[in-house]
């Protein structure tokens, strides 16, 4: 038996090919692989990464787990699984990220990057919340933090709060009210998220208010997932450590999403669930 693990998202796709013991014997990389936003492009990149990882090895028995952005869109996930020439489970990247971070242990994951999600793994079962995207949520994320500062700048211009040095700086960069409005109409989550590091490092009152609001959202999400006996929290994402709370014990991540996909591919119970 050989195993294939794939981690794919908007920024790229990675694949590993492993022997029966889990030893990685091939790796491949390719382009964006969000199967909900562009199925054909994602399929091409996924197949390219897998073919690169496999090389010229002719394996008769293969099991694969693919953790992909957009896999919550069931028709796309089912179509991809049917297209692959070996048994495959296509799951959300959240599933493989949590398994990679926690291994088989119980715990909570708080993933704070451009977007955000929170998940609990308890007795082998996962439950995730968040991950709705900036328009509907992604509370506490880099995009949410940046947008919150933009909203505060607008409210400051209306007189609801003070125009602090940081807000004045932002408004000057945007060329004032009209520029702020124009930016907001076309800004992607990544556009808003680029302001987050500046906010997290600033002592400006507006930055402190936004940071406090972000941490309140993060605290509420983790508290919602915590069972009666609190679990340790593993922080993921580029902003995870910058927003980490000391309310619960912390535990470093064991591995990444690709590690999680490989572990699930090798786990017999995952294939019978």
Q: For the regions a protein language model found, what residue spans apply to each?
A:
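ATP-binding/phosphotransfer module of carbohydrate and carboxylate kinases, centering on a glycine-rich
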Residues: 1-58, 100-108, 150-273
């Amino acid at each position: 038996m050989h195993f294939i693990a794939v981690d794919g998202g908007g920024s790229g796709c990675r694949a590993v090919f492993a022997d029966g013991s889990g030893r990685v014997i091939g790796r491949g990389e390719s382009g964006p692989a969000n199967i909900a936003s562009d199925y054909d492009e994602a399929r091409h990149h996924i197949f390219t990464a897998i073919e690169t990882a496999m090389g010229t090895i002719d394996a008769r028995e293969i099991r694969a787990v693919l953790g992909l952005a957009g896999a919550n869109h069931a028709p796309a996930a089912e179509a991809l699984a049917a297209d692959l020439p070996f048994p495959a489970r296509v799951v959300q990247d959240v599933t493989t990220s949590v398994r990679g971070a926690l291994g088989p242990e119980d715990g909570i994951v708080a993933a704070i990057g451009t977007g955000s999600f929170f998940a609990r793994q308890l007795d082998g079962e996962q439950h995730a919340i968040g991950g709705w995207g900036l328009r509907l949520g992604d509370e506490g994320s880099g995009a949410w933090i940046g947008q919150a500062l933009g909203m505060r700048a607008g409210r400051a211009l209306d007189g609801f709060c003070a125009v602090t040095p940081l807000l004045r700086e932002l408004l000057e960069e945007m060329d004032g009210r009209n520029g702020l409005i124009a930016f907001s109409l076309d800004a992607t989550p990544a556009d808003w998220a680029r302001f987050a590091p500046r906010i997290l490092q600033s002592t400006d009152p507006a930055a402190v208010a936004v940071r406090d609001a972000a941490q309140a959202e993060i605290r509420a999400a983790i508290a919602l997932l915590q069972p009666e006996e609190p679990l340790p929290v593993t922080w993921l994402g580029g902003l995870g450590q910058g927003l980490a709370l000391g309310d619960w014990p912390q535990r470093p991540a064991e591995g990444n999403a690709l590690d999680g996909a490989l572990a699930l591919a090798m786990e017999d119970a995952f294939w019978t669930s």
